A protein has these predicted regions:
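Alpha-helical transmembrane-bundle signature of multi-pass membrane transport and export proteins
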Residues: 1-203
Length: 203
């Protein structure tokens, strides 16, 4: 019998930990969006580059999903989530080095790499949910996950905009990197009982 949202959440400590790590990572992923837009407009004034940035981020996220699915089947899912977060700490901080129009394509490239890593995290997280949640609770868990994704997207972008307007882009990127660090720390104690798909391995 499917549990209600509150009962499910209160009775699944491992899911709560995974959910918290994921929401914080999602907030970080979208927190820097406004800061990146601001840098592009400040240094280039190009609406075209804004479109390129958004397109690159979305295309790389979408096109990488089949490969990410294979990785989630063949590799440790907790490890994929942890290390994708760790890698994004340095990448987020690297945006602080942007200081002119000549850095715009580098900015777009780094942002695209972050979305690739975000895709790795999201796919591994979704694949990990059945490892820590009873089958009858998967619908509830997936509903919470979908709602959290949409909420984190909007909230992360909004908070990023507030920080940029009050404290500047450097502060936004520092806070952004801290969200990935915090998400990684939350993941450390999490135990995910995963059976590696041996059929996916090569000879």
């Amino acid at each position: 019998m499917t549990k209600g949202y509150i009962e499910f959440f209160s009775s699944n400590p491992r899911y709560r930990r995974l959910w918290a790590a994921t929401v914080i990572s999602l907030l970080g992923e979208w927190f820097n969006t406004i800061a990146l837009f601001f840098l592009i407009l400040e240094y280039s004034g190009s609406e075209f580059l804004l479109g390129v940035l958004f397109s690159v981020r979305m295309l790389l996220f979408g096109l990488s999903q089949p490969i990410n699915g294979l990785l989630a089947d063949r590799l440790n899912r907790k490890g994929l989530m942890f290390w994708s977060n760790i890698a994004q700490i340095g990448l987020a901080l690297s945006f602080i080095l942007v200081d002119g129009p000549e850095d715009m394509w580098w900015l777009i490239t780094v942002s695209g790499i972050m979305m690739l890593l975000h895709g790795v995290y999201v796919t591994a997280e979704r694949a990990a949910v059945p490892n820590i949640v009873a089958e009858e609770d998967l619908i509830t868990a997936n509903a919470i996950g979908s709602a959290s994704w949409s909420t984190a997207l909007c909230t992360g972008a909004m908070l990023g905009g507030v920080v940029v307007s009050e404290y500047g882009t450097d502060a936004a990127f520092i806070i952004d990197s801290m969200t990935f660090l915090l998400s990684s720390i939350i993941l450390i104690p999490l135990v995910i009982e995963q059976k590696i798909d041996e059929s996916m391995k090569g000879p």
